[in-house]
A protein has these predicted regions:
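N-terminal non-catalytic structural scaffold regions of very large proteins
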Residues: 14-33
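Active-site loop ensemble at the mouth of alpha/beta enzyme cores that anchors a bound cofactor
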Residues: 35-41
């Protein structure tokens, strides 16, 4: 599967200059993004199969607020990891590339196709350099807002810490 980039240009107010806008891709799957030193190359590979029924998905039973009927909604987990040749190539911890990776290290929560939160959520230690070599997106629809503790302004999630023993049992 190839991930496409939408190229957007914009004009700065009070200027005749046209600038190009590139997306920031926390999974590093897009060829055209803001990744330092890799303008036209994806630096990571997708490690989950989006179309496989048993991989990367958790089903939640919820009550539809409109129909009041129970329905199943999916939460999709997508993971990427650095390509081996780039891992070997990029050893300088102070390079622009490594700085870019460090800024993007974390878990992205994506609600209805839009990233609403990003961070470590206490699942791993950001200071460990090897944590920079993978990415994670957790995708869900608005019907699951309560499950994720989505704030009223739709700008974040709450209580996304490691599960305790009781929660794991449930």
């Amino acid at each position: 599967k190839k991930y496409k980039t939408i190229n957007i240009t914009y004009k700065v107010v009070g200027s005749d200059k046209i600038k190009e806008f590139k997306p920031n891709d926390p999974l590093y799957l897009m060829e055209e993004s803001t990744t330092a030193g890799y303008k036209n190359k994806a630096v990571m590979n997708l490690r989950t199969n989006d179309n496989h029924p048993n991989e990367g998905k958790i089903e939640f039973k919820v009550i539809d607020p409109i129909t009041k009927k129970e329905k199943i909604e999916n939460v999709t987990f997508r993971f990427s990891s650095i390509k081996s040749e780039i891992f070997v190539e990029e050893r300088d911890q102070t390079s622009d590339f490594m700085t870019h990776l460090k800024r993007n290290t974390g878990i992205s929560f994506v609600r209805a196709g839009r990233e609403i939160d990003f961070g470590t959520f206490d699942f791993f230690d950001l200071s460990i350099a090897t944590e920079r070599f993978w990415g994670c997106e957790i995708l869900f629809e608005p019907i699951l807002d309560e499950v994720f503790g989505v704030s009223n302004n739709k700008q974040g999630v709450k209580n996304m810490n490691a599960l305790n023993a009781y929660q794991k049992k449930e």
